[in-house]
């Protein structure tokens, strides 16, 4: 791309802005100063796309993100789609010097991140790979390089033939009848039932990246419930995956992308540790504060401000978690699959393709976004910030939500707000591991407490523009019947403040005017 500020187009998988792991390294001071404790990377392994959910080689960091030490070769000419002629790309991603240098750089980066007291989570895409993958080699780039065995697309005698499910066993060479995830031929589904070698190789990969010298601190698992062709295989795979990972690194976390009830994978503690928390965080909070669906594809005004619906949803979906699983669940407001929360505050239904990218920034309500962040930082779970949210970045659902970070155009006040609320979250044990109690629910007014034996927090979220009087029976959460509470932060239409203010509790009741 010529312009850093240009928004991604609808078919932008081959558009690159030049970001890499060296750029992350240069911004570690910023992340550390913000209060970040864990960096979750979207896929980093070799892949032809910018999103990299179509992995080409599980054993190597993409040199475009890592290190290109040997370059050269011609570029594809305009109008040419034969990737066998993409000489420069082939050299970059198949040359072992580039691949090994990229792995070394990643190991060094993780070491530096660890030295700063932060951790690293990798994105694991094990349900499917990409059509460029060396095991399939539909684009024949590994065939061209001459240093690799034949891919399953190329030859029926490929050692990887059973890594994929082919419908036509007589269509070689160049067999296009392999199974694709959701029918996408660019995303070949991996056939674990058909290949013990594939199964074992992925178990090796799972352990490799959480072991020295790479020492990642865990995996986020893409479309984890889709893996395999039966529930039995799915659960067996994740049990074995857990054994491989935890044997290599007992402290590594395993969290899954999952929509719906995760109980099958969580209840015995033998598969996933936790999940990306859509049902028990992102969705109920989005409906309550904005009345919007998480892709901005639908509006339900009746849910906006409905504390009853919010509380009912939270109670129902949180019941699927054990406490330890809930406390480390990934609580996001935005991510790479959904519209950014700031854009949802404008309550516009649609996508960039129909409304235009500028519409994502029109009519946004930063005050509502700050409300969401307050809940995120005071709710049970691991608050997870999608890059740029803290700087005011907008965007409809993907790919528009994958805009570049707005360097030089950040909302500095919003960054300061995040830094302060993150600090508050980290300084108080009650906000991280304390009990949760709903105190009061009214039209657009949500009140709850987080508390333990040593400290108690009362959180009030008024989703109306008008100020209102509130009376709460706070004795229920362990606050003495006669006490003085101190305000730690307030956010409103004009901004936020850390100015302390005291409130008296009389007969166990807190009154706020």
Task: Tell me what each language-model feature is.
Residues 32-39, 114-121, 215-219, 249-253, ...:
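Loop/turn elements at helix/coil->beta-strand transitions in domains of secreted/extracellular proteins
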Residues 28, 106-110, 206-207, 235-242, ...:
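Generic structural signal for well-ordered alpha-helices
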Residues 40-51, 123-133, 222-228, 257-262, ...:
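Short, solvent-exposed turn/loop segments enriched in Gly/Ser/Thr/Pro and often Arg
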Residues 1, 9-10, 17-37, 46, ...:
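Carbohydrate-interacting/catalytic domains
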Residues 132, 238, 242-243, 251-399, ...:
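Conserved alpha/beta catalytic core and glycan-binding cleft of carbohydrate-active enzymes
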Residues 31, 41, 58, 113, ...:
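Conserved, mostly hydrophobic/aromatic
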């Amino acid at each position: 791309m010529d312009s850093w500020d240009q928004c991604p187009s609808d078919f932008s998988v081959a558009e690159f802005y030049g970001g890499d792991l060296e750029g992350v390294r240069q911004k570690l001071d910023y992340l550390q100063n913000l209060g970040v404790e864990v960096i979750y990377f979207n896929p980093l392994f070799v892949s032809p796309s910018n999103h990299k959910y179509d992995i080409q080689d599980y054993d190597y960091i993409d040199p475009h993100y890592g290190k290109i030490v040997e370059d050269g070769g011609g570029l594809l000419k305009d109008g040419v789609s034969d990737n066998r002629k993409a000489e420069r790309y082939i050299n970059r991603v198949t040359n072992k010097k580039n691949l090994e240098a990229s792995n070394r750089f990643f190991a060094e980066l993780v070491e530096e991140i660890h030295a700063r007291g932060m951790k690293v989570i990798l994105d694991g895409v094990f349900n499917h790979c990409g059509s460029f993958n060396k095991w399939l080699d539909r684009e024949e780039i590994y065939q061209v390089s001459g240093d690799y065995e034949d891919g399953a697309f190329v030859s029926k005698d490929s050692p990887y033939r059973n890594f994929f499910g082919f419908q036509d066993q007589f269509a070689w060479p160049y067999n296009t009848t392999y199974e694709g995830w959701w029918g996408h031929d660019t995303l070949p589904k991996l056939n674990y039932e058909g290949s013990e070698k594939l199964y074992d190789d992925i178990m090796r990969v799972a352990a490799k990246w959480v072991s020295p010298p790479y020492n990642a601190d865990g995996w986020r698992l893409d479309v984890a419930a889709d893996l395999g062709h039966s529930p039995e295989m799915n659960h067996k795979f994740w049990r074995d995956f857990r054994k491989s990972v935890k044997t290599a690194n007992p402290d590594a976390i395993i969290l899954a992308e999952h929509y719906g009830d995760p109980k099958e994978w969580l209840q015995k503690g033998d598969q996933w540790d936790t999940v990306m928390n859509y049902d028990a965080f992102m969705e109920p909070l989005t409906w309550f504060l904005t009345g919007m669906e998480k892709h901005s594809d639908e509006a339900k005004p009746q849910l906006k401000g409905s504390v009853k619906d919010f509380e009912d949803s939270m109670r129902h979906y949180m019941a699927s978690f054990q406490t330890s699983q809930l406390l480390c669940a990934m609580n996001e407001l935005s991510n790479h699959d959904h519209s950014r929360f700031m854009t949802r505050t404008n309550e516009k239904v649609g996508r960039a393709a129909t409304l235009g990218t500028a519409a994502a920034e029109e009519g946004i309500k930063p005050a509502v976004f700050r409300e969401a962040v307050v809940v995120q930082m005071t709710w049970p779970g691991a608050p997870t910030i999608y890059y740029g949210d803290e700087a005011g970045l907008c965007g409809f659902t993907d790919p528009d939500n994958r805009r570049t970070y707005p360097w030089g155009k950040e909302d500095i006040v919003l960054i300061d707000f995040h830094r302060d609320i993150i600090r508050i979250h980290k300084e108080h044990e009650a906000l991280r591991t304390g009990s949760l109690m709903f105190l009061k629910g009214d039209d657009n007014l949500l009140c709850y407490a987080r508390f333990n034996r040593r400290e108690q927090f009362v959180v009030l979220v008024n989703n109306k523009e008008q100020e209102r009087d509130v009376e709460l029976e706070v004795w229920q959460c362990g606050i003495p019947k006669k006490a003085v509470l101190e305000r730690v932060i307030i956010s409103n239409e004009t901004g936020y403040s850390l100015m302390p203010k005291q409130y008296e509790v009389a007969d166990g009741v807190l009154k706020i005017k």
